[in-house]
Amino acid sequence: MLSVAKRLDAISEWGSVVALTYIAAQRSFVDYSDMADAKAMLESITRSFGLIYGEARHVRINTISQSPTATTAGEGIEGMEQLRLFADRMSPLGNADADDCADYCVALFSDLTRKVTMQNLYHDGGFSSVGITGSALEQIFS
């Protein structure tokens, strides 16, 4: 899609492209399977086309690694609701919901982030940086 957009000059100079990914692109998550591979490829395309399109038209291309979020696609993943609840408990700020994600996308489309490109930006309430919380340990061993 990005290759066609570049060939057709379909994105304005200094435009922004944002795609959604998930932490399973970098870490193992049970039952995420082929989707993890697809998300890893998406993040790689973000870096590659971020360079190509950035040099050509200053187009910014980023991915957002979102919290486990209740979506139509997510409903097809076995155990997704349990993962969402677990991530919410592990995140110092709690999970970011779909509305929070939409707000973050708007910020990335704005000129306030005009120098942010080729990044995978975590939007997960801190889940991606936490090893384990005290409350999770208590839950595991109680």
Regions found by a protein language model. Give the residues of each.
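Hydrophobic positions on the long internal alpha-helix
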Residues: M1-L8, I45-T46, Y104, L108
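Generic structural signal for alpha-helix termini and adjacent loop/cap motifs
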Residues: R7, S110-R114, I132
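Catalytic loop of short-chain dehydrogenase/reductase
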Residues: D9-E55, Q66-A70, G94
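Short, small/polar-rich loop/turn modules that mediate ligand/substrate recognition or access, typified
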Residues: W14, E55-R60, V116-M118
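Short glycine-/acidic-enriched loop or helix-start segments at secondary-structure transitions
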Residues: F29-V30, Q119, I132-T133
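A glycine/serine/threonine-rich, flexible loop-to-helix segment
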Residues: A56, T63-M90, D100, G131-S142
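C-terminal helical subdomain
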Residues: T63, E81-V116, L121-G125
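Residues immediately C-terminal
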Residues: S128
